[in-house]
Curated annotation (Swiss-Prot):
Homohexamer. Forms an RuvA(8)-RuvB(12)-Holliday junction (HJ) complex. HJ DNA is sandwiched between 2 RuvA tetramers; dsDNA enters through RuvA and exits via RuvB. An RuvB hexamer assembles on each DNA strand where it exits the tetramer. Each RuvB hexamer is contacted by two RuvA subunits (via domain III) on 2 adjacent RuvB subunits; this complex drives branch migration. In the full resolvosome a probable DNA-RuvA(4)-RuvB(12)-RuvC(2) complex forms which resolves the HJ. It comes from Bifidobacterium longum (strain NCC 2705). It comes from the Bacteria. PANTHER family: HOLLIDAY JUNCTION BRANCH MIGRATION COMPLEX SUBUNIT RUVB, PTHR42848. InterPro entries: AAA+_ATPase (IPR003593), AAA_lid_4 (IPR041445), DNA_helicase_Holl-junc_RuvB (IPR004605), P-loop_NTPase (IPR027417), RuvB-like_N (IPR008824), RuvB_C (IPR008823), WH-like_DNA-bd_sf (IPR036388), WH_DNA-bd_sf (IPR036390). Residues 4-198 are annotated as: Large ATPase domain (RuvB-L). The RuvA-RuvB-RuvC complex processes Holliday junction (HJ) DNA during genetic recombination and DNA repair, while the RuvA-RuvB complex plays an important role in the rescue of blocked DNA replication forks via replication fork reversal (RFR). RuvA specifically binds to HJ cruciform DNA, conferring on it an open structure. The RuvB hexamer acts as an ATP-dependent pump, pulling dsDNA into and through the RuvAB complex. RuvB forms 2 homohexamers on either side of HJ DNA bound by 1 or 2 RuvA tetramers; 4 subunits per hexamer contact DNA at a time. This is Holliday junction branch migration complex subunit RuvB. The keyword Magnesium does not apply. GO terms for biological process: DNA recombination; DNA repair. GO terms for cellular component: cytoplasm; Holliday junction resolvase complex.
Amino acid sequence: MSETTDYGASNTGANEESLRMVSSQPIGNEPVSDEELRPHVLGGFIGQPRLKAQLQLFLDAARKRDVPPDHILLAGPPGLGKTTLAMIVANELEVPIRVTSGPAVQHAGDLASILSSLDVGEVLFIDEIHRLPRAAEELLYIAMEDFRVDVMVGKGPGASSIPLTLPRFTVIGATTREGMLPSPLRARFGFTAHLDFYPHEELEKLIERSANVLGVNLDTGSAHELALRSRGTPRIANRLLRRVRDWAIVHDLIVVRPDDVKEALALYQIDSEGLDRLDIAVLNAIVRNFNGGPVGLNNLAAMVGEESETVETVCEPYLVREGFMIRTPKGRVATEKAWQHLGITPKDDVSKLF
């Protein structure tokens, strides 16, 4: 197994999002990827079959050529396994991995210090790489392309730049916002992998694997109930599984049945669609208070007692993706699916909108 060095990697995200059970960001001190649940080889990584096939070919070719692989960019929503894949790459290559994050790199010198300490073949994993300072990005361009960093010696007019040659290494960058990466930085990655949300079937397999690791005896159908509520995101699935495990321990359950899953997660106000209290409050406001919409973002946020940014960035992406809401030039509109989920008969003109 590869050696891991952590240079201030941080778990960041909106404060409001980090308090939700269905958040794709880590909650509190929750690790980005639990060591006990993390697979260490590509064959043990569940889901993302096309990406795995591409990555396997990429790594096999590097091993046969006996050179470190090209730099890798992992892009996709939070909680889908980007950090886990970075660890797997290092394990597959049997090399150490250094871990840092964009927010942890305050100055270009911080990054230069890390780069200058790398050995041949090492992996440098930069989480949230889109949040690197501009000066650090520019330093990284040269390091990734030419395997050198320019060290400034002296100050003022007499300052000079001395090139420091670096051993060949591999950068793995992870980002939830690929569009924020400057084109010169994106161009230096030889392989870009896009992670997608998981279908229920793959999430069920992941939940069953995690349950075995955690010692949770799930009855037939229990993994399915968990998958329905996990928003296509492994991090959420594992978090909800832990809460169900707590329920089973407190209630002395030997086998966790589907009804136990429903009851345990109902305690946290998580329904069968993965919607929580805030999601339901938003839908209720649109449907009950604004007759289905359209309603402006500020009015909607005021109705549910949240900041506009919270509603827009925390709630809306999932509600839109799952077809409960649409954004129109006039405002937010609840779909027929939203009315039905709330148990309210849609008004006559709702179905005509879609």
